[in-house]
Amino acid sequence: KGGTRYSLKLLPFGGSCMMLGEDEGYDAPGETEKGSSCDQNQSLTDGKTDRLLLPPGATGTYFNAVSAWTRFKVVVAGPVFNFILAWFCAFFVISCVGFDPASVVSVEDGYPAQEAGLQAGDTIERLNGTRTYLYRDVQTYLQFHPGKSVTVEYVRDGKSYTTQMVPRYSEEAGRYLIGISGGVYRKPASVIQTAQYSFYEVRYWIRVTFSSLGMILKRQVSSNDIAGPVRIVSMIGTTVKESQSYGLMIVLVNLANMCILLSANLGVMNLLPIPALDGGRLVFIILEMLRGKP
């Protein structure tokens, strides 16, 4: 319709939008040099093979015939809009329930944090130089670096301090702890602060995705911990079912949280330099731009 060919796959997981000539299954009529265009009367197949030609009514320039810079912008737009969608979902969630600043609510006796001088009300700014905006940043950093010495930069009454500690293993918790608690959500003071912490939320999930990929490569997690499409759909269904008793708004907030996670994860995965993904195609386009030729 209108020069666009629509299709529904047997397994409708995910989706895609391809420019004319972007799919290797399409054959161009004649040469596909820069500036070549489509023949509106070209049939859908060549009549001899199953190779696809142009959709009826398609006009314009082939994807591979335009400049490398134009193709770069088209390919990178997909992952970028994954991150933009994640940001909008984060904006909705934070507007409804607030955010969790990296502030210490309490310090447990006998743990490294108390011994190093941390107090309730302190705000942790960096762990080994890594900036922390959310309390979850603190939690995940310690989770991904168990038992390792950590330099903590924190703020108290407007003044910056630095201390060092080594997380201690807790038999009760089954993991390494420094002995602090936090994660109390706070409503944003303004629209600007909501937008700011929406960015930090997306940043958090991007960092978690990269850290998780590192754990997979190091074989620190099993294949059972990796969720495929079926498991993701099941998780969404479970989330909706468990949230229904709390009202529609809680259901929407939980679904938006899932959307942040999935969109940020998909954006990162698509940028990986693997041939079948957008990242792999970007590598070849960048090489073409550097060389000045395909």
Regions found by a protein language model. Give the residues of each.
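Pore domain of cation channels
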Residues: K73-I84, N257-L271
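Alpha-helical transmembrane signal-anchor/signal-peptide segments
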Residues: V97-Q114, Q119
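Membrane-embedded helix-turn/re-entrant segments that form the catalytic/gating core
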Residues: K1-C89, R186-A189, T194, I285, ...
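Conserved PDZ fold ligand-binding element
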Residues: A113-Y135, V202
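PDZ-domain C-terminal substructure recognizer with occasional recognition of PDZ-binding tails
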Residues: Q119, E125-R126, T140-G182
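Hydrophobic membrane-targeting alpha-helices
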Residues: F88-C96, G267-L271
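Juxtamembrane/interfacial segments flanking transmembrane helices
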Residues: D100, G228, L272-I285
